[in-house]
Amino acid sequence: MTRSLKKNPFVANHLLRKIDKLNTKAEKEIIITWSRASTIIPTMVGHTIAIHNGREHLPIYITDRMVGHKLGEFAPTINFRGHAKNDNRSRR
């Protein structure tokens, strides 16, 4: 279910402050965050945000097509390596 329109999109306060500070300075710097639930807003476009996936921070460059999505959507937490092979020779 989507978030109610009368509420604003959720963005962590510390992340919003860092974005605003970099926008006023017009600098580009990697922003490290653990806030996977934050929504990408238009002021984040053009920045690189390192999103935590449970083990490490993955640097993600924010484009205009990502606006409205959550940060966690772009940092997968598990890696599927395929199903176990059915090798009958090793069972004998």
UniProtKB/Swiss-Prot annotation:
Biological process, per Gene Ontology: translation
Coiled-coil annotated spans: none
Assigned keywords, A-Z: Chloroplast, Plastid, Ribonucleoprotein, Ribosomal protein, RNA-binding, rRNA-binding
Any matching Pfam family: Ribosomal_S19
Predominant subcellular localization, coarse grouping: plastid
Key word Lyase present: no
GO molecular function, one term: structural constituent of ribosome
Tree of life domain: Eukaryota
Disulfide bond sites: none
NCBIfam families from the UniProt entry: rpsS_bact (TIGR01050)
Role noted for this protein: Protein S19 forms a complex with S13 that binds strongly to the 16S ribosomal RNA.
HAMAP family: Ribosomal_uS19
Family membership noted in the UniProt record: Belongs to the universal ribosomal protein uS19 family.
Name used for this protein in its record: Small ribosomal subunit protein uS19c
